[in-house]
Amino acid sequence: MASRLPRSSRSRARGRRFTPLELAIGFALVGSVAAIAVPTFVREAHASRLVEPVDGLQRIGTAAVAYARTRPVASAFPSSAPLTPSVPPRGHCEPDAQNTWDHPTWRDFDFRASPAGSPHCFSFSFDSALGETRATFRAQAHGDLDGDGAQSTFEITGHAADGDPAGPAVDPGMYVESEVE
């Protein structure tokens, strides 16, 4: 037969309270974890919103170079594409209307900011300048992540030139202005 604890032991076990020292240690542990986790989470969440313009411009640059490799310099890049969508979403991400990305340049590049029906936070543009011996392009992403009316700008450039042994290329670096707007 199993022995039973005396009645007074059972009531003490059920009513056990934490000492002030145990509470202080627990509070310190929770505070330490929060002090590490919260800033990291906020930083990563913010950085994830900046992936869209960087990734989008890299895809445009790659498509522009691939396009130029198959054409003479005078027609190395397609015609300029206006800011698409024409007004960047303000303070939130939005899905596009059905035909938003139907401009011939976006079709040539097989580019959309996000999959059909998925919201995105940036608008993109592509400008090309074609000459007989040199052609250049500028691709931009504009967004207003905090909704205050001020826009952030991300920009890459590229070129194709007659006699350039490297061929068409995206220029090194990315111009960024007001990245957290």
State what each model feature region is:
Residues 144-151:
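Acidic, glycine-anchored loop motifs typical of Ca2+
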Residues 13-45:
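N-terminal single-pass transmembrane signal-anchor helix
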Residues 122-132:
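Short amphipathic beta-strand and strand-loop transition segments with alternating hydrophobic
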Residues 151-181:
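Low-complexity, S/T/G/P-rich flexible repeat/linker segments used as non-globular hinges
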Residues 51-59, 64-113:
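Short, glycine/small-hydrophobic-rich surface segments
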Residues 1-18:
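N-terminal leader/signal peptides at the extreme start of proteins
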